[in-house]
Amino acid sequence: MKKSLILTFGSLFALLAGSLPAPAQVQAEVQAFQQSAGDRSILYRGKRGARYTILANGHPYWAQPGFERGDIVFEGNLYYDVPINIDALAQRALVQLQDSPFSVELTPENAPAFTIGDGHFVGIGPGGALPEGFSEVFGDGPVHVYKHVYKLLSSNTQNVNGDPIGYYDPDYRNDVTRHFAIRKVYYFRDAEGNFSRFKGRSALIRQFQDRKRIRQDVKAIQRRQPDLSFDDFCKAVLHSAAQ
């Protein structure tokens, strides 16, 4: 583990003290957190997660700003039911402190696997087969699809809410030129463990020998769900291929 991720409760909250009202309140929060965290405490001894103060439309998170409950592997231990999110700009997993607006960040190497809601994620360190950061994994069989999401801080004087930035911001401001744009990259992992990047629905189906049957199965699903998202399309293809 890198030294920057081994902070005691005292040093962690010393970093936060400048943003909190008074030392007595800081100490009270430290004590309350230590009591509530219990054997999870080591999970929270990380560097404080970034709190972006720049004025920009959108947000830097994977899907939404709020935290969701999930399970996470950290230093070989599995921790259940902790509030997790992903900073897609910095490619860091965020774990929210108990009863606090603050979070700690974990690198991909230190958070190799976790769940957020129904999603399953893996952390990829430098030199891996996939881009460094976090990817969501689809599929339970011998083949998988990996979805890598990252955010970029961009600038545009036009109204780019919605498709141009990749998602809709209900609080979009036309007088703000900077925004967090989203990018999504998909990879196919075959049964031998080889990765290949693909773009589009047909490209995924071409990865399989039994593509004719898979295409028929997926078309039947699309007739029932004409607005099937690309992620759900990937899951449907993998489910059909596993039959």
Enumerate the predicted regions with their spans.
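Hydrophobic alpha-helical bundles in membrane proteins
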Residues: 4-5, 25, 39
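Aromatic-patch recognition
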Residues: 73-196
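Long, compositionally biased interface segments
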Residues: 196-243
